[in-house]
């Protein structure tokens, strides 16, 4: 209850700070202990009149005065007067500054120049405003509080705090008791709300026992006082002071470092792991140890007892390593050396293109040993046993030394290519004034011209000579993919993959070649840059337009090549765009135009 001398007021609800609950009751004022009242939070208090009020909780109380005043009180009038006074002082300071400025300008117009005396006088005049500004600093502007009115048009003022007197709105405010001396130390924490049974269990813990971590139990929060508040005594928590110190126990599975044995005995049951004698290879003999001992990559023969005898970690290198390093000294593979021929072995048929180093011609070659992969021509039946159809790459005359070195590097690289889907280097001629290299050629020509002779059918039944099913086209695409994977494993970038650079043999065998970009037959599919460089822009990825070629750009070109295969070479990629539009669409990056799905493309493509 709220109590006031000579008045009976309505009861009000209140809330005490966490972990302390209670109810208001009438009681006398106690001057010795008023700490708990500083933690009270009272809301929705309804008072009938101003006066002196007392709040009591559990024998502790505090008194304060409540003033009910109009919104148009004398405090607001004093605020208006202070505001007018400040405005007048500001106007006086502004007038003084303006007079000083005009005076200095007049002196300048009269004398025609500024002097130190004028500046000194202006500074002294301006400093006269300093006292006025200092006076303004000491004036407190009135603070405008929000007018919280009740039904009677009055407001409740409680220790310079505004409290809404309307009980329908819940507003919290802390009631602080007046203290003569403010203490810097924080108020003590309120006790935990525990039941008597929980407290007895907590205080009855045996200090001799090992204390386990205390699990916090959920406590009930009720609006009434707990049993401790009603009894008038506040319990204290038991202090957990005698906790057992943490100490590392001795682990029986470990020993000190000084007692460790330096020898290790392997528990082997005379059986060896079934490891192959070489990586990615199978055993050639019945016994694994036979392969292991006779394998040429080992420097010494290996005895199986080496794996079962007692060994020491401080042994010599021969005991620890019974065989020499496997990868430090690998077996040197014999480099495949191409056959050296002369100009007399070449009989040119026709020119088929112009490559990086010079012209590329189709020729017949006689007396070529080891030409099992070459296809004999049908032009001269009497020379079927000694004539092969080949492609000859010539080096331009009068080239620089740098170009000559690049030509030699290509010979060394291409001579090592050995794959069923890559054309082979057959012979070279490096001692002549006009050096050249001889490459394998297929009797059916390039893939682009080969596909244009056919018509696509949906199934493999009743095929005519000019019909081709989608399964055969997929077989061609798989062969090209196999060859490109092989080139990628050697870090080789083709840069010009297309059906025109793929050759066709018997039974639809496909081999990747690179006979030059500016062939007369396909000159229209290349874009000439500044009259010299020629780029296959319709097969190029976006980054290739900026000079970056990689395995990813070859993958893009492979996708366009597959599109060519399923259109039977009868359509040009992006044929609806001219060269300039093609370049603009490619360098745009995101949102680049994608070609339509051709007929007969399988779901796995």
UniProtKB/Swiss-Prot annotation:
Location of the Ig-like C2-type domain: 1-67
List of catalytic residues: 496 (proton acceptor)
InterPro entries noted in UniProt: Ig-like_dom, Ig-like_dom_sf, Ig-like_fold, Kinase-like_dom_sf, Prot_kinase_dom, RTK, Ser-Thr/Tyr_kinase_cat_dom, Tyr_kinase_AS
Keywords for this protein: ATP-binding, Cell membrane, Glycoprotein, Immunoglobulin domain, Kinase, Membrane, Nucleotide-binding, Phosphoprotein, Receptor, Transferase, Transmembrane, Transmembrane helix, Tyrosine-protein kinase
Reaction it catalyzes: L-tyrosyl-[protein] + ATP = O-phospho-L-tyrosyl-[protein] + ADP + H(+)
Main location: membrane
Enzyme class (EC, first level): transferase
Region (Disordered): 209-230
Signal sequence, start to end: none
Extracellular compartment spans: 1-84
Entry EC number(s): 2.7.10.1
Sites of Phosphotyrosine modification: 527
Family: Belongs to the protein kinase superfamily. Tyr protein kinase family. Insulin receptor subfamily.
Protein name: Class II receptor tyrosine kinase
